[in-house]
């Protein structure tokens, strides 16, 4: 049976997508703002955990109160995979823009509602139950938030600037933390700790609603990403009708054909988010509860660290466009393995300057991960399953990473060893290193299932020329390999004359 050879049309200049700079800026702003609001809540919750422990879990000793409050923080991560599957399938069916508008609505309302919950003294057991329900609603919406936002930015970004553009997404995360922590410190300082415990802790959560409305306005005004529009345009009419009728996503296909990418995604997210939650969510509680600093003192140190991270974040993304994503994952993992214990030795030194230095070491390591994560993850999967695959893998990983504050607090309480969080980070560093070694480089390459994307016509011509040069090099390599095989064949014939018989 003769196989029919399929002709592939060579790529032309018209096939390179020119990204409009104005739309790109709007896309990054809208995505980063929603992400900032997500982490604003995480920041506020981490920094007021001591207050929530007393409001919702009275009667327990301070250690149990802290673990209970942080456990309430961690439980919603059990819901995130469900949100990831739900919003991921819808995002591949209806597009990224619509889903991101929905997630920010749910997230802002549920965060706002936390500030409305009465204390345990007023409604008893219903207080922690309502808190848990609000956190679960957050977890469900966040299941589609970060992955959708990272895909949105990646599909809008030029290939050569995807690392830099993607880094602004986690810039928004850190900025959200800074805002949340700053608001907590400001309110606590202005009204005093007594009033803050009584009612002041509610005020930061009320800010979520206006922030959410701003984010909704920005996201609603955006167009769908170029990559998703290309995907829909390529579909035949029957396939397009099928797309509207139901999600065209096969999770069996994702698990069987993209399992390597799933493992890379899981490993990178675990390494990044465990470090994230350890530094930015657990550390304020560690400084106040384990090292006995005042709450405001510990928060101010973390705020200073995060402000420094804001300046480093886009630099990491910019450098990753030049040197690739793999080096940052590998170097960051090695650094974390060898510096985790020294950094905690500095943090436990009881000297402010050394404490700051220890936290700064962890922050730079975290920047190495966050600087490349938002640009690396979307590049692992093709357009038609990108949201579903990424949301599923990401939220399974976050399910593990989200337990970090609770696990770290429990390890310290049960062992009375202040270095247990450092040992935990060393284990995570091994996961990060294996991920970095086995992941494929994605920098300066088109997203799977999409045409090349450029900032302007000049860059498009350069990309096209590089593409043609690569084809010529591949042809030359194939020709050389054929010549080498022919030479080996001739040698075998000379050694074994009967081989031609």
UniProtKB/Swiss-Prot annotation:
Any one GO molecular function term: symporter activity
Keywords: Amino-acid transport, Cell inner membrane, Cell membrane, Coiled coil, Membrane, Stress response, Symport, Transmembrane, Transmembrane helix, Transport
Spans within the Periplasmic topological domain: 60-66, 120-122, 192-195, 283-298, 348-350, 413-417
Keyword Transmembrane helix among record annotations: yes
Membrane topology: Multi-pass membrane protein
Coiled coil: 461-495
Topology, Cytoplasmic side: 1-38, 88-98, 144-170, 217-261, 320-326, 372-391, 439-501
Null allele phenotype: Disruption of the gene enhances aggressiveness of the bacterium. Under anaerobic conditions, disruption increases pectate lyase (Pel) production and increases the maceration efficiency on potato tubers. Uptake of glycine betaine and choline is completely abolished in the ousA-ousB double mutant.
Subcellular location: Cell inner membrane
InterPro entries tied to this protein: H+-coupled_symporters (IPR051084), MFS_dom (IPR020846), MFS_sugar_transport-like (IPR005828), MFS_trans_sf (IPR036259), MHS_symport (IPR004736), Osmo_CC (IPR015041), ProP_C (IPR036292), Sugar_transporter_CS (IPR005829)
One annotated GO biological process: amino acid transport
Segments traversing the membrane: 39-59, 67-87, 99-119, 123-143, 171-191, 196-216, 262-282, 299-319, 327-347, 351-371, 392-412, 418-438
Job description of the protein: Involved in uptake and accumulation of various osmoprotectants. Allows the uptake of glycine betaine, proline, ectoine, and pipecolic acid. May be a contributory factor in the infection progression within the host.
Homology family: Belongs to the major facilitator superfamily. Sugar transporter (TC 2.A.1.1) family.
Protein name from the UniProt record: Glycine betaine/proline/ectoine/pipecolic acid transporter OusA
């Amino acid at each position: 049976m003769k196989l029919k050879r399929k002709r592939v049309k060579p790529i032309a200049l018209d096939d390179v997508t020119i990204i409009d700079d104005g739309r790109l800026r709007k896309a990054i702003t809208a995505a980063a703002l929603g992400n900032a609001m997500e982490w604003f809540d995480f920041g506020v919750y981490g920094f007021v955990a001591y207050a929530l422990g007393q409001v919702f879990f009275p009667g327990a000793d301070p250690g149990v109160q802290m673990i209970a409050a942080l456990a309430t923080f961690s439980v919603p991560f059990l819901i995130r995979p469900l949100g990831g599957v739900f919003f991921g399938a819808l995002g591949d069916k209806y597009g990224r823009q619509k889903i991101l508008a929905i997630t920010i609505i749910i997230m802002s309302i549920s965060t706002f509602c936390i500030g409305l919950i009465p204390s345990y003294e007023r409604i008893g057991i219903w207080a922690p139950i309502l808190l848990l329900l609000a956190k679960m609603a957050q977890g469900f919406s966040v299941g589609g938030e970060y992955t959708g936002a990272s895909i949105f930015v990646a599909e809008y970004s030029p290939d050569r600037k995807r690392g830099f553009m993607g880094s602004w997404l986690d810039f928004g995360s850190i900025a959200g933390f800074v805002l949340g922590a700053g608001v907590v410190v400001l309110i606590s300082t202005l009204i005093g700790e007594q009033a803050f415990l009584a009612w002041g802790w509610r005020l930061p959560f009320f800010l979520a609603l206006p922030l959410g409305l701003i984010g909704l306005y920005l996201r609603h005004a955006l167009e769908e990403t170029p990559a998703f529009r290309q995907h829909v345009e390529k579909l035949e009419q029957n396939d397009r009708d099928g797309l509207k009728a139901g999600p065209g996503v096969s999770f069996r296909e994702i698990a069987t054909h993209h399992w390597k990418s799933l493992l890379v995604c899981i490993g990178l997210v675990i390494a990044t988010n465990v470090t994230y939650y350890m530094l930015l969510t657990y550390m304020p509680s560690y400084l106040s509860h384990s090292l006995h600093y005042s709450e405001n003192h510990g928060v101010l140190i973390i705020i200073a660290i995060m402000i420094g991270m804001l300046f480093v974040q886009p630099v990491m993304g910019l450098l990753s466009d030049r040197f690739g994503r793999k080096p940052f994952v590998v170097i960051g993992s090695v650094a974390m393995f060898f510096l985790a214990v020294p950094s905690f030795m500095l943090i436990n030194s009881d000297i402010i300057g050394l404490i700051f230095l220890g936290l700064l070491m962890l922050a730079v390591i975290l920047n190495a991960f966050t600087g490349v994560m938002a640009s690396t993850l979307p590049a692992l999967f093709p357009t038609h399953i990108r949201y579903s695959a990424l949301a599923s893998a990401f939220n399974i990983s976050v399910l593990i990473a989200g337990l970090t504050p609770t696990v770290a607090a429990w390890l310290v309480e049960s062992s009375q060893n202040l270095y247990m969080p450092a040992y935990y980070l060393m284990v995570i560093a091994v996961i990060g290193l294996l991920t970095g070694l086995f992941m494929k480089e994605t920098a300066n390459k088109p997203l799977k299932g999409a045409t090349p994307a450029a900032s302007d016509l000049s860059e498009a011509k350069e990309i096209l020329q590089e593409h043609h040069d690569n084809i010529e090099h591949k042809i030359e390599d194939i020709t050389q390999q054929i010549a080498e095989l022919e030479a080996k064949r001739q040698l075998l014939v000379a050694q074994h004359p009967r081989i031609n018989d």
